Each structure stands twice: as C-alpha cells, then as structure tokens.
Amino acid sequence: MGNNWIDTVIKEQYQFVRLLKRTDKTEICVFRHRELGKQIVKRTLKGSGEVYFALRTLSHPNIANVYDVVKTETGVTVLEEYVDGQTVADYLQTGLYSPSGVRKVISSLCDALDLLHSHQIIHKDIKPENVMIDSNGNVKLIDFDAARIYKPFQSQDTQAIGTMGYAAPEQYGINQTDERTDIYAIGVLMNVMLTGQPPEIRLYNGRLKRVIVKCTQTIPDNRYQNVKELKRNL
C-alpha cells in the first residue's frame, strides 16, 4: 500500500528525468516536479532499509537529505535530495586536488561522519563516486546502500560489502565494521585525491602522508579512533 501511494505521487506530480544507476539490488532515478521544477532522487532497493529509516530522522549540511522511506514487498523505496554538482571522481578526471583542497573536503566529510557515527551508522563505501561537491561548493556524502547500523555485540558483519581498494580489511569478514572502517576509507580517498592512486601503489609524500598512513593501518586499533581525532590532525 505504501509503495502504491508513493508511486502514485511520483507519477502524478513528477516527470522522469534520467536513470542514474541500476544493479540487481537497486535502481536510482531522478525525477523533476512538474510545477515547481525541483528535482529529487528515487531509490528502490532490496533489503530492510534500516539505515535509510535512521537517516530520515537526521539532517546535516554535508549529507544528502532523506525525505521519506516506504517499505515495499521486496525492500524499500527512498525519496532523497538531488545534489546538483559533481563527484570527487568527476573532478579527478581533470586533475588532482591540492593539499588545502583535500583538507576542506575531508574536514566536511568528518563533520558528516561525526553525526552518522554518533547514531551508530557506518557508511562502509566512502570513495570518490560517493562524495559530491554541490553547485555552492558544499561537500555532500551520498549513497548509503552499503551502510549498516553498528551492533555492539556482533563479531562480524553479516555481509561483506564495499569497494575493493577502499574497503578496510575487516569488511571481508575478519571483524565487525565500525567507525574506524570509514576512517580507513578516508585515508585511501585522501591519497587518491592527491596522487590519483591508492596508497599501496603510490603513497603521497607531503605533510598529509602521516595522516594517510595512520588512517590506513591494517589493525583498527592503530588508526585514528574517531573522526574528531582525524579532523584535528588534518
């Protein structure tokens, strides 16, 4: 019933613009309001969608807003903010970031993750494609399809999800992921923004090297333990 309602609203009030992504588990489309012209993202995915239900109650300038979440027979439908801008991956097609540019992006990313981690939300897929810079220059963290809620007494994740090269070792079933998992990915992201390569191929050799090295330690206890600590060391 809920899904029929949301599909009816989309059909009556919005016009399809384009398909952003389609996999066996998710479909992401952009729609434009017929009268107001405002664009939104409609995400249909399999699974419980518990992270999106949690995100619906949160608001942060560096996180794409989730407007509504509705259960369906096979998963959930999510209506979320459309971010007009380019991803870090798009920018890297034209050149590398300066150290000051990296500090600006990562500082905002740390602010977003500080809120998420305080609600036990682990993103698990931080990479250039999931970090956007909007038309006003604001950083926006997007795509929570791989995210999970941290469970204090769980020994490991039920699913190994992430992007190879950015995923921390514990994402492959060694231990449960936690906020330090996202810190690992931030370290890889910083190195890619500065060199175009992951640290194991070409480690950045400037002042941010020590931050990257600490973020990407194999053992979580040897990394920064939270994003506040990471941000202080940028």
Language-model-derived ranges and their functions:
Residues 15-53:
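ATP-binding glycine-rich loop module of kinase domains
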Residues 73-87, 91:
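Conserved short submotifs of the Hanks-type protein kinase catalytic core
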Residues 59-68:
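Conserved HxN/HPN-centered segment at the entrance to the catalytic loop
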Residues 105-106:
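Activation segment signature within eukaryotic-like protein kinase domains
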Residues 157-170:
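Conserved activation segment of eukaryotic-like protein kinases, specifically the C-terminal portion
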Residues 182:
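Conserved catalytic-loop aspartate of Hanks-type protein kinases
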Residues 117-133:
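Catalytic-loop of the protein kinase fold
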